[in-house]
UniProtKB/Swiss-Prot annotation:
It comes from Homo sapiens (Human). The active site is at 88 (glycyl thioester intermediate). Belongs to the ubiquitin-conjugating enzyme family. Its EC number is 2.3.2.23. This is Ubiquitin-conjugating enzyme E2Q-like protein 1. It is found in: Nucleus. Probable E2 ubiquitin-protein ligase that catalyzes the covalent attachment of ubiquitin to target proteins. May facilitate the monoubiquitination and degradation of MTOR and CCNE1 through interaction with FBXW7. SUPFAM superfamilies: UBC-like (SSF54495). Coiled coil: none annotated.
Amino acid sequence: MKELQDIARLSDRFISVELVDESLFDWNVKLHQVDKDSVLWQDMKETNTEFILLNLTFPDNFPFSPPFMRVLSPRLENGYVLDGGAICMELLTPRGWSSAYTVEAVMRQFAASLVKGQGRICRKAGKSKKSFSRKEAEATFKSLVKTHEKYGWVTPPVSDG
């Protein structure tokens, strides 16, 4: 897959990719950088978090349909990351997706959204150790898409997280 080769050539080590069970359709992506002026970057430094780990699952008809993308770890709050690690971004929906998008571009947009939405690493006792689940992420994503199809996609104020 050309996408994988392009990411391997990135000079800024923004992201790195590992195939899950050697499948080209299932990637774990490490996001190594967010805005260094953000509270999320500060959280990452304070908690010795080297990266945000995401999982991308690609449909058979990629790039004509978006991948399913979710956060695996660390557990995040706000930043448009919802239950199960689901991500609230219109470009990850069939309506918002374009076959011209690259994984790198999607990851850069996600990094910007995390910061814009005031994403933080969860430090609440008990909750911070609880893993995100794929089943919960899929259900949450389905629900948020249905809600946005009904009411539209708007950019909420930053204070809404």
